[in-house]
Amino acid sequence: TVGDLWPLYLENGKPKRKDAWKPRYRADLEAMAVPGGEKKKRGQGVTRPGPLYPLLALPLAGVNEDTLKGWYDREAEAGKHQAARALMMFRGFLRWCAARPEYRSLTDRDAGKAAAIVESLPSNTRRTDALEAAQVPGWWAGVEQLSNRTASAYLRALLLTGARREELAALTWANVDFQWRKLTIADKGETTRMIPLSPYMAQMLATLPRVGPYVFASTGKAGRITDTRASHAKAL
């Protein structure tokens, strides 16, 4: 079954010319196939199965355009972009199987590329809001001058840490360790990761008012910063 081969793929399917998966990507591969049913670390209830988990029970020879289309349509109901990312990862698995003589005859390498599936994928829009290296000094100076000090610190912290917007917006004071200079950031899934807290950023965060559990607090309903587009536009 796919479930028998998936661990072998994780162990041996590293990209060409590389010694190993990138740790973050390897973790994402594992998360995509978890069975779920575990108690959530945050909030109530149990975790959902990973998008790829339903495919693990299939025999490799049973993975074809029809089975993948049915699987993708079901997963897309929970989230199109997550389902699309899972599909891209599974394509890598099929390529790996097709490249191995012992699995080649059982593998439909192009099952995930069928027109019926590709036409259902969400369109990828090229980002136009990314900063070029030459723009950073001017952008930084503009952000520093913002009257909203919380928005100013938040925007600079995004650039300094490389964290996702929602991850950083949800940062609480309990997850800021000024003594050991680190931040604990909640990932998309149920995991966390550590980010070093530079002296500059530590000083910047220390100037923010502690008016609630969130570092980047707001008077809005969420209690934390949610939309900085207006402040960002002023800095540009």
PLM features: residue spans?
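Basic, Lys/Arg- and aromatic-enriched nucleic-acid-binding interface segment
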Residues: 19, 75-91, 99-170, 179-180, ...
